[in-house]
Amino acid sequence: MMHFNDIDDDQIRLIGEPNKEPRPKRRWWIITAVAVVIATVISVIFLCSQNDCEEMYCENPLFYCEASDGTAYIYDGVAETRGYTLITDTTINDIPLRAYTPYGATMSLHIGALNKNDSTIVYAARAADIRADNGGIVGAFVLNGEPRAWGISKKGYCAAINGKVVIGVAKNTHLFELATEQGGYFFRQYPLVSNGKLIENEPKGKSIRRAICEQQGKIFMVETITRESFHDFAQALVDIGADNAIYLTGSSAYGWAVDQNGIKHEFGEDDYYTGKLKMPKNINYIVWRTRVTP
């Protein structure tokens, strides 16, 4: 009779407690960790959609940021109620620049004095130059479909037709006629950048410089904080990535921008508005107005 302690050479004795069901603690720990990761990702996406992650998509601080689908999202909540201008400062080639990017606004042209209390204006700056001899506008100019001046003394142009702004350089362009036919706007100025290439201009000397620029369809205005030459200013615009740019009347020319907080930022000198100087009858401006009345 074999006892419990007896074992043959061809037998194996198992020592230990009987098998038990595996404990599910490790499995539940993994599930919990995965759930936490998913919740974190969802939270980040939600916060970004609430405008808390602007800098994640901002490669160039001069321009407004875009979400991955290409839609502007910085201060979208503000843009839905009123337009504004995003104001940003940077330095390129030791030249301090200030950029103005309009949101929720449409560009047009204006001749004559502006109403400084007009709450629909989010950006205004002098556009075409004025002749010193007869006070006429230099270069072709179309105001709400009406030609007010003709000529190609300067090859740079800016057109605003049906809400779309086009900046370019050409001796002849169909946009003058198109602006006339469709109630649009058109003016000419010195060309600064064409297809990403610097364009030299004859005027020398240094002054506060301004320009209206386009980069991949985005429109923004830039001014220098210090007095600069045409060449250095144009080079700075090339270096910030402007595809096309033309000049805006600089020096002490008056204008202003309204930021996302409703604060008005004036530049230049308002001598024409205080009566210190007589205002030219053909003084003209580019004007960005909010699409939604405040």
List each language-model region with its residue ranges:
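Conserved, well-ordered active-site substructure
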Residues: 135-152, 205, 214, 218-244, ...
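Conserved beta-alpha junction segments in alpha/beta enzyme cores
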Residues: 187-211, 216
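Zymogen propeptides
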Residues: 2-150, 222
